[in-house]
Amino acid sequence: MKSLAVAKRYASALFELAREKGAIDSISHDFEVLEKAIQETPDVKKVLDNPVLIPAAKKELLEKLFPDFNPITKSFLKLLVDKRREVYLPEIIALFAEKLREERGEMLVEVESARELKGDLSDLIKEKLSRLTGKKVTMKVRTNPDLIGGIVVRVGNKVYDGSIKNQLYRLKRSIYG
């Protein structure tokens, strides 16, 4: 719980500064690049999470890996490293993106499907959800063969499970109690 509170304070402060300086889009892009690097390159995450590594080494690495980042993003990352708060970075990135979507009247919807969604179906789901919520929908789609068929949709903290896996589970529970 404490980590979420800390991450919220940093994300809010950065978002307000970014709005003030007109750098929201630039910082958002920087965070997308950084998030991708953390997810796809385990060494980046290991370095950031390593409490033994001195801050100067972490800052030097970040500067070498991301020389084109906005100066505000660079300063923010250096501040996090100096304050030993870099472990909160994934949460800060997610909260910053959430604030940006909120400001733009957008909503992130996570869709999990047994197979890859074809273009028309993906567009149809997005359109329906947009009409239901009254917001522009951004979809994060991933495949999960364990679902067997159907989809699972996560909108905020609600989950709509239309998967065959869930239907079989419910059938099993109704039979065996």
From Swiss-Prot:
The keyword Hydrolase does not apply. One of its GO terms (molecular function) is proton-transporting ATP synthase activity, rotational mechanism. SUPFAM superfamilies: N-terminal domain of the delta subunit of the F1F0-ATP synthase. InterPro entries: ATP_synth_OSCP/delta_N_sf, ATPase_OSCP/d_CS, ATPase_OSCP/dsu. Its main location: membrane. PANTHER family: ATP SYNTHASE DELTA CHAIN. NCBIfam families: ATP_synt_delta. This is ATP synthase subunit delta. It comes from Carboxydothermus hydrogenoformans (strain ATCC BAA-161 / DSM 6008 / Z-2901).
